[in-house]
Amino acid sequence: MMRFFVPLLTLAAVSLLIAPKTAHTTTATQQLAPHGSAAPRDTRTRPNQRQEARSRLAQIKRLYSSGQWKEVVRLTSPEAARDLGLQPGAASDFDYYRGMACAKLKRWTEAEAAFERGAAAAPHDKRFPTELAGIAFLEKRYGAARRRLRQALRIDSGDAYANNFLATLFALDDNLPAALKYWNRVGKPRIQAIHVVPQPELDPLILHRAFAFSPGSVLEARDLSTTQQILNSLGVFVHPRIELDALPTGGFNANFTPDPKAGLGGTKLDDALTLLRGVPYQTMYPDWFNLRNAAINFSSLLRWDPNKERMEASLSAPWDGNPRWRFQLHLDGRRENWNLSHTFFAAPSPVNDMQLEKIDGGAGIESIVNGRLRWTMGLDLSGRTFRNVHWNDPAAAAFFTNGFALEYRAGSYARLAAIPERRFSLDGSVSTRLGKLFARDSSPFAQGEAGLLAQWFPRAKGDDYQMTTRVRAGDTWGVAPFDDLFILGLERDNDLWLRAHIGTSNGKKGSAPLGREYELVNWDDFKTVYQNGFMKARLGPFFDTGKITDPTGDFGSREWLVDTGLELRVEVLGGATVEIFFGKDLRTGHNAFYGTTAGY
């Protein structure tokens, strides 16, 4: 027992002798640490060494102020720190001045190493990530510079230098929303003047009202967003964008370079692109923009396909010259042949030649509340006639009832989240329709839809690898007319796309599943593969999945549908876009090829 007991007593005695010294030891590096940051204790530092360290730091500051960079580097070397009894990297002020002196001498690697040591010793000192950002910027490592500046701002979010530096980096990447996020923290940018060059052929009062900010004010991020939303809603400019120019006085000029949409009446090439882009599928698009220089737009569609005849026209304009409010009138007439042999399950024999004639007209209004919120509402009157359709279930007759219907529609669209420095946004939408078919035994019906749209641009600049995810769902209460049913499929008159389920067969609509309830997810990711002054080609994969059902069982997809493939988008002269789809239905293995065009 004694041979174990004696060593334990000896160990306890040694611990008692050592403990008081450890508890009261204070290092010179703790006294030198900036902003009260704690530094590692060094039990080897004696009082005379602490005094010597303070004297050395004062000498270093004098030498730095007088521009003697090499002498500062010599006095702050790791060897000099060891001579003072300081652990390497523990004296953060020594590391700071060493890094600054090396930077003055353009010895970037040594400067970065010194700042890294200082950052490790004093993680709450904003000087180190700020200076590291400066080195990264000079070496054109802009991503690293942004990361370091965000690190500095996590320590002090109000630091004027770091905010201005980071905002400038985002502005150089043409990411003005992100730049404003940081400039606004320090009361910048103050707008001296708004320049519109060249002046567009648009009523100056309408253009003036489109800007939510004015000279002499600080451009806030929310005002830029509102202005962009209003300029887009005018419908007369292609991709409107505002840029800032810094002035020697510290202010900024806001520059807007309008790029007018080219409808009919422009150059011959513009006329051809506008009017004839749909000729491959027997369609023309006569469009006129900015009529009477008052942001009045007329859009129309003429289709002579014998299975999908259609004439549609719409007129929109600012309400009383106020671009925040816009009204629209529309008229749409169509005569279509439908093949429902694989999508309508209540017929005694396949319905492969149903004809639908419909005329629809109405009016609506849109209001832009701000850059994050807008809403719409309208009223439509429609009439329809069905031919060559039959059914077993009497309940199915309600879908194919001839007659007129009155529908009220409303919707709201909001920016739910935005992280401009990450180039990420999340938008939400909600819409509803309330209608009544004026026919015997018909009851009111309602439809509701909701959706989320997430967009992410992973590159700091440009649109390479733009990723989009869209989630939508809809439901119907009551029995809506057949022409108001939801359709999941790729078809030019439909926007609920499953890109390997083509909505027509031998030219007739009806091959895509229909119903009163649906869920749909679309994802795609695009890479620019070719670009010149005339065109831009983007290619990327897509993935779609969804399901559509009907309470009666007369329509629906029966199971979840899953599609994947490639999509090619070719944008010509910044306007008309050609879209080509190569899709595969993962349920059946069927392949799909489809092409269409889109306007501005």
Positions of PLM-derived features:
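Periplasmic polypeptide-binding modules associated with outer-membrane biogenesis and secretion
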Residues: 103, 116-127, 134-277, 284-288, ...
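Bacterial N-terminal signal peptides
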Residues: 7-16
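Compositionally biased, proline/threonine/alanine/serine-rich low-complexity intrinsically disordered stretches
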Residues: 21-55, 62, 66, 84
